[in-house]
Curated annotation (Swiss-Prot):
Keyword Repeat among record annotations: yes
Pfam families reported in the protein's UniProt record: DYW_deaminase, E_motif, PPR, PPR_2, PPR_3
Chain positions covered by the region annotation Type E(+) motif: 614-644
Name of the featured protein: Pentatricopeptide repeat-containing protein At1g71420
Biological process annotations from GO: RNA modification
PANTHER family per the UniProt record, alphabetical: PENTACOTRIPEPTIDE-REPEAT REGION OF PRORP DOMAIN-CONTAINING PROTEIN (PTHR47926:SF382), PENTATRICOPEPTIDE REPEAT-CONTAINING PROTEIN (PTHR47926)
Each PPR repeat, start to end: 58-88, 95-125, 126-160, 191-224, 225-259, 260-296, 301-332, 334-367, 368-402, 403-437, 438-464, 466-496, 502-532
TM region positions: none
Amino acid sequence: MITSLSQISFGTLRRFGSSVLPSALKREFVEGLRTLVRSGDIRRAVSLFYSAPVELQSQQAYAALFQACAEQRNLLDGINLHHHMLSHPYCYSQNVILANFLINMYAKCGNILYARQVFDTMPERNVVSWTALITGYVQAGNEQEGFCLFSSMLSHCFPNEFTLSSVLTSCRYEPGKQVHGLALKLGLHCSIYVANAVISMYGRCHDGAAAYEAWTVFEAIKFKNLVTWNSMIAAFQCCNLGKKAIGVFMRMHSDGVGFDRATLLNICSSLYKSSDLVPNEVSKCCLQLHSLTVKSGLVTQTEVATALIKVYSEMLEDYTDCYKLFMEMSHCRDIVAWNGIITAFAVYDPERAIHLFGQLRQEKLSPDWYTFSSVLKACAGLVTARHALSIHAQVIKGGFLADTVLNNSLIHAYAKCGSLDLCMRVFDDMDSRDVVSWNSMLKAYSLHGQVDSILPVFQKMDINPDSATFIALLSACSHAGRVEEGLRIFRSMFEKPETLPQLNHYACVIDMLSRAERFAEAEEVIKQMPMDPDAVVWIALLGSCRKHGNTRLGKLAADKLKELVEPTNSMSYIQMSNIYNAEGSFNEANLSIKEMETWRVRKEPDLSWTEIGNKVHEFASGGRHRPDKEAVYRELKRLISWLKEMGYVPEMRSASQDIEDEEQEEDNLLHHSEKLALAFAVMEGRKSSDCGVNLIQIMKNTRICIDCHNFMKLASKLLGKEILMRDSNRFHHFKDSSCSCNDYW
């Protein structure tokens, strides 16, 4: 049909009057325009329209083209058609239907001003006119104007199901509840469009009670469509009711209802955002989801696969399946997928994350700011700044040097890698800084124990401090023993409502007071807290009780910790065992360890890392799993022998007291992972050209013990080198028999 239509000689048609043009030909012309539009050739349709006789340029033809422009967001052709129509008044009368098409076209194309002008000049309007403009405001993000227009509409005509569903799309709880009530009054609540919109509206409130109101609406719907199910799952997900969301999904699946990409994305979000799910439930559901995505073919969609990767990595810490899934995506891996897998490994396996970043570059993909941010997080988990320097160069080459977020990430990475000078250089070179920039620099100084530098930086801060700012300041004062300065900063937080102390600030103050052996004041702060102390507070107190041998308060903190984090956390048992050991109560210490074994609680393995010749070497206490174990032991033995001549005496309080053989007890103490790492670095340094390097860097996953701290101080004097150690709390700069922490850590 369209071929014959396009071949019509319009010159021949013009010789006939409009009276002789059959209405069938006019309908055929309109249908021909629609066919061209459906085939994606809107330009040809518009060209054909302009070259047609006036008699064929009917209101139906205009309407068809306005609708096409709306669907394809073609504002330019829409405006030209509107001008053409106004310049041919015999083609256009004040027609409500045609004006509605115009409003819809302008609204869909994002020009809400023109849509409003058409609406305001209409001599009469119907429900479609109001709905089209309301929808336009909502889609443009101007929900307030849309709701005001809806309120005005009620004095002119009744809304229909499409009006209500459009208004509900942007409503908050109170106005949304009123619209829901109106729907019930008008009998429009039975409409699937209205019901779905009501469910979504309640879900957006992020409130459990509202989610159950959505559930009531959901259960009342007799014939649910896929959008209904997805809306209910999304509502529970938004309200952090993951278990409920999964329950809806399971029911949906058992009822034989199909699912789509939106379903799977909402369920994945439910799994890693909700706090009401236990690991076993997450694991079971994740495996089922993975199976369903494979069977349905949706696993080939990048967003779905990336969401699954996030669940595997963040919730299950199952990096094997996470990586396997990523490798199966070889045909559809975009930058979002790469960002997901790099982020997954950034904390768990930083070296793998760096390797993945290298693979991304080999595949000729251009990293975005999120990629660089994730890989810099991985750099922060490595021993040295070597990789951070390389990524920094690529950030500059990629044109991201002015990006504040990336500069903040660079400061964090360099600080964690021990390069405080590079942190300062990045900070000083920044064109603009936000509060995170200042906080990152303050945290860097705090991490390295530079309390004399942190306070001047804080005084120069030209942005209002936030909660994290005071955490950095209080932590620095705590680790440096600057109690009075710390208390002054803490008291200043009460001066403004926006800086009132939160749990973490109280934890810092309690840590600061108890480190200084001011336990009575620490107890008083706990009693005066406006909220219940959390695990962080009791852990801070427990650590200092161990250091100063306060058994009574340590027992209280350990018991509170067990109540809060369940008896499966190793911290309370180990710290109490150490406290009992220190005071010579070995039976009580052993009972604490046996209680830990009864609950099958596993202690975090003691691991250390050092980098030699661009290769990272890992050490576990006792040197297990290393082929060069005997050689490292021999080197360590030599070091210990020399250090004992310098006055080193093993601190037996740091040894495990459940070993009956005293010689074995000392042997166990001397084979802590950081000592092995140092011995290896010394041994390898003699073999390589790096023997003249005056810095040895070691990273440790737990807090350094008293004995190892004493050992490192003397070793720095013996070797004539600086030993830079990062433990779970902070950096220790050992040099000439002293430490930057002044033995206060």
